[in-house]
Amino acid sequence: MKLDRVIIIVLDSVGVGALPDAAQYGDEGSNTLAHIAATVDLRLPNLTRLGVGNITPLRGIPPVGTPAAAWGKMASQTAGKDTTSGHWELAGLILERPFPLYPHGFPPEIIEPFEKAIGRRVLGNKPASGTVIIEELGAEHMRTGNPIVYTSADSVFQIAAHEEVIPVEELYRYCKIARRLLTGEHAVGRVIARPFVGEPGHFIRTDRRQDFSLEPPRPTLLDAVIAAGLEVMAVGKIKDIFAGRGISRWIHTHDNMDGVDQTRNFMREGERGLIFTNLVDFDMRYGHRNDVAGYAAALEAFDRRLPELLDALETSDALILTADHGCDPTTPSTDHSREYVPLLIYGKRIRPLNIGVRPTFADLGATVADLLGVPYDLPGKSFASMLLE
């Protein structure tokens, strides 16, 4: 007998140790969760009970003799360490080539057609921290009306604009234009709208960010679940990451706690299928800013909410906690890190056992399909037979 429902929660960037090829990405020695625990007095009693301390050594978070969940970790086989490819691999789509990166900004063959299409010049066109570049160029943007374009170590084309200078809907239109232009060798993973408000010296990015992702080039777990007549409910930026494909219902969120609330709301409805949630604050607000204390506080805040999710599980449910990459806030880099991701699987019918090290995130997609009884022929090897009582 299979399960009725699986809830996947991606703790965005909560990596658990450098992958063997991490040095190729400049990430040798990274371990997001362990280094946070080594730096601050991290207390995660509920995750500890599930077995997070059994996955990787954590100061102050010991392994437990009998974890409440199945535990393990997964390696990535995708080329890259970004949000989109990480989530796609979780859903059974492994990319052989990484998305293009622009460490020196975007070339004229990208910028010139974009400027012509929107009827404005762009400011910036370089890699930058989003909060830094709006402080640097925000006043000029307000004076000229020209949007700020920037990138990062991720495959992203980001457009920042003050909401009173370029209305948000117009900013979204610019992003759709960029998305249409960024194809072929320049097919970046995401075009991102980054609206902000305020005055020079006091700019604040708003929660009206929107991602315009590439559509997955091949089917994913989400398509398989929909094809089987089940629901796929997306919380947070999941809908954007998959460009809306394979999703029956979705809701954006303001922050991690809203993400937990919206996940609970979908759970209350009792629909059969998949709830797929991304909690982005760990990465966006703390990892990229090297804010160790903030990252730790966000982990503890999620840990306090975890019992609500566990208590809401029905007999034929499973809750899966994992991540998409690392973003070690204790290293000089402010970029993602190439890491293993944790795997905790809890449910009334789930055996609490050591899953070990899975060779690809795609094993999770195959396992979820198996747990739901969904026909599936994508990459990855199911370990569902280990899990079910």
From Swiss-Prot:
- GO CC annotation terms, alphabetical: cytosol
Cofactor(s) for this UniProt protein = Mn(2+)
Q: Where does Mn(2+) 2 bind?
A: 283, 288, 336
* UniProt-listed Gene3D superfamilies: Alkaline Phosphatase, subunit A, Phosphopentomutase
Co-factor note (free text): Binds 2 manganese ions.
Q: Which UniProt keywords apply?
A: Cytoplasm, Isomerase, Manganese, Metal-binding
Its Gene Ontology molecular function terms?
A: magnesium ion binding; manganese ion binding; phosphopentomutase activity
Reactions catalysed: 2-deoxy-alpha-D-ribose 1-phosphate = 2-deoxy-D-ribose 5-phosphate; alpha-D-ribose 1-phosphate = D-ribose 5-phosphate
User: Where is Mn(2+) 1 bound in this sequence?
Assistant: 12, 324-325
Pfam families (alphabetical) = Metalloenzyme
EC main class here is isomerase
Q: Does the keyword Acetylation apply?
A: no
Enzyme Commission designation? 5.4.2.7
- Pathway noted in the entry: Carbohydrate degradation; 2-deoxy-D-ribose 1-phosphate degradation; D-glyceraldehyde 3-phosphate and acetaldehyde from 2-deoxy-alpha-D-ribose 1-phosphate: step 1/2
Role, per record: Isomerase that catalyzes the conversion of deoxy-ribose 1-phosphate (dRib-1-P) and ribose 1-phosphate (Rib-1-P) to deoxy-ribose 5-phosphate (dRib-5-P) and ribose 5-phosphate (Rib-5-P), respectively.
PANTHER family given in the database record: PHOSPHOPENTOMUTASE
Q: Which family does it belong to?
A: Belongs to the phosphopentomutase family.
- According to UniProt, the name of this protein is Phosphopentomutase
